Regions:
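Outer-membrane beta-barrel pore domains and translocons
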Residues: 44, 55-57, 141-145, 180
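Outer-membrane beta-barrel transmembrane strand signature
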Residues: 1-51, 95-112, 117-119, 123-127
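C-terminal region/CTD detector
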Residues: 37, 51-53, 60-62, 130, ...
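Membrane-embedded beta-strand positions of outer-membrane beta-barrel proteins
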Residues: 52, 138-140, 177
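Surface-exposed loop/turn segments flanking beta-strands in extracellular/periplasmic regions
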Residues: 14-19, 71-86, 156-166
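Strand-connecting loop/turn motifs
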Residues: 45-48, 133-135, 170-172
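C-terminal beta-signal and terminal closure region of outer-membrane beta-barrel proteins
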Residues: 81, 91, 100-102, 147-181
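Extracytoplasmic gating/loop element in the C-terminal half of outer-membrane beta-barrel translocons
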Residues: 2-5, 57-142
């Protein structure tokens, strides 16, 4: 519409032939990233050591099917208990029907570029003496610590390009004790 909001079941005549049909369909971005990257660091100071590993992608897009399924009034009003599953944009979009045409819209395709802190660890080695093989080391580590992304769905890192009610990746903490004699 004039305000830039999507309209339910309305599509653009992209090729200008006066008809909205199969010939107007197009590919709006892609799930594959343009760039994959990663970097890590490790630091040691006296008895302390620290390590971190980051990775990410840039230029990938995701179809947010979670928002698509819960983003129409028909989808959340059919049962009063579904109202709590509605997404923020259910009133913004004005989508009233829950038909297949929403899958043909590019409204739910979102930039899924991200930077993820995959692993971080900090360790302390107790009373290590020079020329001694014995040591006691305590380590605290975490995996999947945080993700920086504009993507509003569950996880920006889904190879298929469709975010469809997957179980989110957990943050995992590990406490380690290493004893050598």
């Amino acid at each position: 519409d004039a305000a830039g909001k999507p309209m339910d079941g309305v599509f653009i005549d992209r090729n200008g032939d006066g008809l909205v049909n199969e010939k107007d369909k197009y590919r709006f971005h892609k799930p594959a990233a343009d760039v994959f990257y990663g970097f890590n660091t490790s630091l040691t100071y006296k008895n302390w050591d620290f390590a971190a590993a980051f990775r990410g992608s840039w230029g990938n897009y995701m179809y947010n099917n979670v928002d698509s399924n819960n983003g129409s009034l028909a989808g959340v009003l059919i049962n009063p208990t579904y109202l709590s599953n509605a997404v923020e944009n259910v009133l913004e979009t004005g989508f009233t029907t829950n038909d297949i045409k929403r899958f043909e819209s590019d409204y739910y395709i979102q930039d899924a570029s991200f930077l993820r802190l995959d692993n971080v660890s900090i360790g302390y080695t107790f009373n290590q003496k020079p020329d001694s093989k014995s040591l006691v080391k305590l380590t605290l580590a975490a995996q999947n610590v945080f993700v920086v992304t504009k993507y509003a769905g569950l996880d920006p890192e889904i190879a298929s390009g469709i975010d469809n009610n997957l179980y989110p990746r957990p943050i995992t903490f590990t406490l380690g004790l290493n004893v050598n004699f």
